[in-house]
């Protein structure tokens, strides 16, 4: 868990230098502004958020509260390095709540209790070495209800709930990092039992989010007020298996996981992989179970939190971010690698994955993995509750193809499209008003489809365009029709955050036009850097203010297709109400 604290009031020249050095090297100007705007108000108020760490990982340090788990096998080296990362996060304004996992500890409840208490104290001592206020081990703020194990909803608090918030809130007020063993006290008898760390994290999340109910004991008014002033901001899951695997990604894992859209795909893939795993390879099935638990944990916790909250799933070693310098040589010929940014700090500053999920495979920067080998992209997954993606027509039913004469086709005036919201999205994103009548007429007969993210927070309109030398009155060879991205829009409030642009772009290149698409942009458009990173190539059209981009493989080797693409990007007529076509 993570809590934004009043660490800023302790700002000094050394802290200023520390912050500036990070902002200058790790994030964009927009990221820096967003971070400062979000955390500067913490001079006057505190907020709370969660982070969790699973098997073989320990508490994390950022200025927010994070629940984390650790096991007896957790190396002391990682305790120290992760503790240092948590302290750095706290310096940046985010305090952590650490949940210590007792999974993998054998023996009776009393024996397991002794072991987990020792783990909690070890973690707290590691934090004390790096943090002025240090850590505090809390006893048993959790109570086990009579119906333990029966609850199925993250909103239900009858299985495990928080009965003593005062010690937790006091430690946060004192800017100490709470370390909580995953132990609960039974409701009807004075007995202590180990509980599932995921359940402990959910119980704390419910309490700090104001969602603990169903007849649980009422806190006094002062504590209720304090709880209302908190905000669960981040969940961190540290697990040696790392981020969520993805067979259909060049990196082999999800860099960004849109839980609303991709959770079922994740569970289906991991379940199938487990069923197909060789009996001689039990490690694969075990790892898949870890990934499933991590994904489920992220989904349940984020369902309780604001849509701006997110979960980071990474390894303890990556969270510790300790790389021997000699590991920078990956052994990959002609490719240089770089040391990875600490995913906890990078995510706090940017709320983005270390590398964008919409980059083509050739653009992922090789990095040194946790085991010292080179890999594409990061081993960390950033998960958000995300948003549903609507694609019309649905490519799962039939791949997008140019419509044949007489076939029914999608139109923007269809009941399945909310045209007023679509127009508002375009107007807001471009800062210009669309000439709706002109635009509808232009795309009426050549609309390929549309992509809508969430409640029209982002979207794309794609068309089939005829090359310049085609007779407008005659049908064109379908093979020469150009797949064209006509409009790509994200609401201004969602630009640069939340992954909306990546979600829409991924849907376009993976589901709608996997074999390639082109688009154009003004040569002086600041978004062109983003386009360059995601395209297979670009070309500045002479005598015009347009630059052409495409994702089509080997386009430059096909002269006819290249000229067709170029002619479309030259000739598509803008449909803006201000008629300032000369600007384009």
Task: List each language-model region with its residue ranges.
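Conserved beta-strand elements of beta-rich interaction domains across eukaryotes
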Residues: 185, 242-243, 467, 524, ...
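Nucleotide/pyrophosphate-binding catalytic subdomain
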Residues: 1-319, 412-416
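Flexible, D/E/H-enriched segments
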Residues: 257-259, 267-386
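Short active-site-adjacent structural elements
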Residues: 188, 244-248, 320-324, 527-530, ...
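A conserved beta-strand-loop-helix scaffold within acyl/acetyltransferase catalytic domains
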Residues: 411-496
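Terminal substrate-recognition subdomain of acyl/acetyltransferases
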Residues: 336-416, 420, 425-441, 491-492, ...
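Active-site proximal loops enriched in glycine and acidic residues that flank catalytic Cys/His/Asp
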Residues: 239, 315, 460-464, 487-489, ...
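Conserved acetyl-CoA-binding loop-helix of GNAT-fold acetyltransferases
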Residues: 496-509
